[in-house]
Amino acid sequence: MERFLYLMRHSQSADKQPGQSDKERELTVQGIRDSIKIGSWLHTQKINPDLILTSTATRAKATSGLLLDTLKQMPEKIQLNDELYDASVRTFLREITQLEDTLNHVLCVGHNPAISYLAEYLTKAEIGDLPPGGLVIIQFEILLWQKIGEGSGTFVKLITPETV
């Protein structure tokens, strides 16, 4: 069965302000525009994630919300996961392999370096660091999400706000 995983780095965020935690950093105006751009591209490609799994950082939640608004999807499609804020590849893998197998298109919004490392681990492609708002599309030929692992995915495309 064909499944798709969309790995996205949150869009451009503001620098940390005095007294503000890193987790509370918000999107810049450019980050908001870029999230809408990527959401519009997904919409024109008729890509509608069954689920958006996102970090609980303000900038990741905002990116996910803007994608959802642009795709005209229901907010219950967002699943917040605090462990994705400072995640390792292992953490992402654990969360993805526990997904319901009724989901065929899953979008994860996270942070570098883990989101970039995960894309390279799953595809064995040299992708490099995802820029803010960057999105990697990975295709799997699997019946169960628990079957994903090193090199099990096929790199389909890298999308950035500058390329759409």
Where is each model-derived feature located?
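Short phosphate-binding loop-to-helix
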Residues: 84-100
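Active-site-proximal alpha-helix that buttresses catalytic centers in soluble enzyme cores
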Residues: 3-83, 127-130
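A polyampholytic, Gly/Pro-enriched intrinsically disordered region
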Residues: 97-107, 151-160
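Non-DNA-binding regulatory cores of transcription-related proteins
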Residues: 99-107, 112-134
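Domain-level recognition of soluble alpha/beta enzyme cores
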Residues: 126-156
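Hydrophobic packing residues within well-ordered alpha-helices of enzyme cores
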Residues: 63-67, 92, 118-119
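Short, well-ordered alpha-helical microsegments
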Residues: 60-61, 89, 115-116
